[in-house]
Amino acid sequence: MPLIYMNIMLAFTISLLGMLVYRSHLMSSLLCLEGMMLSLFIMATLMTLNTHSLLANIVPIAMLVFAACEAAVGLALLVSISNTYGLDYVHNLNLLQC
C-alpha cells in the first residue's frame, strides 16, 4: 500500500476517533464528519485517477455533493439548536425530553 493511501486512511481514522471522543458538542462532531468526508473524497478521487475509468469519474463528484448537503443541513441544525437552547450540545437534539 503506497504511503499516500496510508496517510488518507490515517486522516479518516483520526476523524472517526475525534467523532467518537468529542461527541458532546455538535460543532466538533460536524467538523470531524467533514474531515471524514474529505478523506473519503480524496481516496475516491485517487482511486478514480488510478483506474483510468470514465464511468467512475462521477463518484467523487457525487460524494462532494452529498458532503455539501450534509454540511448545509448540519449548519442549519446547529443554528437552530443554538438559537433555541443557547448551547450546541448533542443531547439537546433528543425530541423526547420534557
Swiss-Prot record:
Molecular function via GO: NADH dehydrogenase (ubiquinone) activity
Q: Name one GO biological process term.
A: mitochondrial electron transport, NADH to ubiquinone
Write down the membrane topology: Multi-pass membrane protein
Upon changing residue 65 to A, the result is: In LHON; possible rare primary mutation
Q: What is the predominant subcellular site recorded for this chain?
A: mitochondrion
InterPro entries according to UniProt: NADH_UbQ_OxRdtase_chain4L/K, NUOK/Mnh_C1-like
Keywords on this record?
Disease variant, Electron transport, Leber hereditary optic neuropathy, Membrane, Mitochondrion, Mitochondrion inner membrane, NAD, Primary mitochondrial disease, Respiratory chain, Translocase, Transmembrane, Transmembrane helix, Transport, Ubiquinone
TM ranges = 1-21, 29-49, 58-78
The answer to whether the entry has keyword Signal is: no
Enumerate the subcellular locations listed in this protein's record, separating them with semicolons. Mitochondrion inner membrane
What's its EC? 7.1.1.2
Q: So what does this thing catalyse?
A: a ubiquinone + NADH + 5 H(+)(in) = a ubiquinol + NAD(+) + 4 H(+)(out)
Q: Which GO terms describe its cellular component?
A: mitochondrial inner membrane; mitochondrion; respiratory chain complex I
Q: Can you tell me which family this protein belongs to?
A: Belongs to the complex I subunit 4L family.
| Protein role | Core subunit of the mitochondrial membrane respiratory chain NADH dehydrogenase (Complex I) which catalyzes electron transfer from NADH through the respiratory chain, using ubiquinone as an electron acceptor. Part of the enzyme membrane arm which is embedded in the lipid bilayer and involved in proton translocation.
Q: How does it assemble?
A: Core subunit of respiratory chain NADH dehydrogenase (Complex I) which is composed of 45 different subunits.
State the disease link. Answer: Leber hereditary optic neuropathy: A maternally inherited form of Leber hereditary optic neuropathy, a mitochondrial disease resulting in bilateral painless loss of central vision due to selective degeneration of the retinal ganglion cells and their axons. The disorder shows incomplete penetrance and male predominance. Cardiac conduction defects and neurological defects have also been described in some LHON patients. LHON results from primary mitochondrial DNA mutations affecting the respiratory chain complexes.
Q: What's the protein here called?
A: NADH-ubiquinone oxidoreductase chain 4L
